[in-house]
Amino acid sequence: MTYNLKKYIRTDLEDFDGYSACKAPELVKTSKQIIKLDANENLYGAAPTVRQAMSEFNQYHIYPDATQSEIRRLLSEYTGVAVEQIVCGAGSDQLIDLLLRLFINPGDEVINCPPTFAMYKFYTELNRGKIVNVPRDASYNINIAAINNAITPQTKLIFIAAPNNPTGTAISKEEIRQILDLGVPTVVDEAYYEFTGQTMVSDMSKYPNLMILRTFSKWAGLAGLRVGYGLFPPIIADYLSRIKDPYSVNIAADAAVRQTMLQREYMLETVKKIVNERQRLYTELSKFGWLKPYPSVANFILCKLLKGKAKEVQHELESKGILVRCFDAPMMENCLRFSVGKPEDTDGLLKALGEMGE
């Protein structure tokens, strides 16, 4: 019997593009020690107390706190935002998805500023919304006038990454305010906040259309545990809490975040080291005549290849045990992105790139 399951699947997903995630280190075929510079993780790892807590934890058979009450209390102290305005999720990705589920009816529009974080488009289309792209300029800065011109009665959300990923481009608070003044609900993604020190939190009382996302994946060394949080107007936080699955932050992640917040000064010291190393990496990459690095305020640097093919360089680096991200989308043709790691990671990358340029 032939059974056609496909006829029951949503027709709008037939040509849906999945997300191309980074390769897990254990899948890399190399005898070399892996230097993982492809996913903007903190290579210093989690705080020592997190690792200790994980080894001693004995409640994996118990469901976690569905409201993440202790995490939210600690985050309230950290951010200065009221507990009832904080919502936690399985990475900020889940919160992006939930926001789109909350705001989007089929055909509603979401303004996106590519090249930028791919999950804005991913979840918009998954939730039957329409992406309206307002491209950045050649230096990857946003075009506020073009955003204004793109707004229609169907516009429900604007996504702004601050700073932008994958380009590392900064955006000023004044520019964000100009976007907020347009009156559309706006999500400011501060995934890399700890590396910049710039936040829009103090503007939340003035702008009821401002929503902020953050994550523990980049600065806190918890990428594998998937924890993010958002700072929202009370009405949005209430709706998100209602539609969010209750156990999305698992019990191991809950325990790890608690320890991270208690040891945040330790983790912020690793952030300072990464910021210092970022400057060294940028300076050294600038010396290669075949690479054009772009200024970055995050924990990675985007480079355009002026000679050669980015995909071939990525494969050559992988054969040496060095994992980097390759991009070839519009406005990012023939580009590589290097996460900033420890000094020894930078040394290994620079040595490998130097050998290729010889």
UniProtKB/Swiss-Prot annotation:
An annotated GO BP: L-histidine biosynthetic process
Pathways per UniProt: Amino-acid biosynthesis; L-histidine biosynthesis; L-histidine from 5-phospho-alpha-D-ribose 1-diphosphate: step 7/9
PANTHER family referenced in this protein's UniProt entry, alphabetically: HISTIDINOL-PHOSPHATE AMINOTRANSFERASE, HISTIDINOL-PHOSPHATE AMINOTRANSFERASE-RELATED
Top-level taxon of origin: Bacteria
EC number: 2.6.1.9
SUBUNIT field: Homodimer.
Name this protein carries in UniProt: Histidinol-phosphate aminotransferase
Catalysed reactions, as listed in the record: L-histidinol phosphate + 2-oxoglutarate = 3-(imidazol-4-yl)-2-oxopropyl phosphate + L-glutamate
Key words, A-Z: Amino-acid biosynthesis, Aminotransferase, Histidine biosynthesis, Pyridoxal phosphate, Transferase
InterPro entries: Aminotransferase_I/II_large, HisP_aminotrans, PyrdxlP-dep_Trfase, PyrdxlP-dep_Trfase_major, PyrdxlP-dep_Trfase_small
Cofactors required: pyridoxal 5'-phosphate
Modified residues (N6-(pyridoxal phosphate)lysine): K218
Family (UniProt): Belongs to the class-II pyridoxal-phosphate-dependent aminotransferase family. Histidinol-phosphate aminotransferase subfamily.
Top-level EC class: transferase
Record gene name: hisC
SUPFAM superfamilies (alphabetical): PLP-dependent transferases
Organism: Dehalococcoides mccartyi (strain ATCC BAA-2100 / JCM 16839 / KCTC 5957 / BAV1)
Gene Ontology molecular-function annotations: histidinol-phosphate transaminase activity; pyridoxal phosphate binding
Pfam families: Aminotran_1_2 (PF00155)
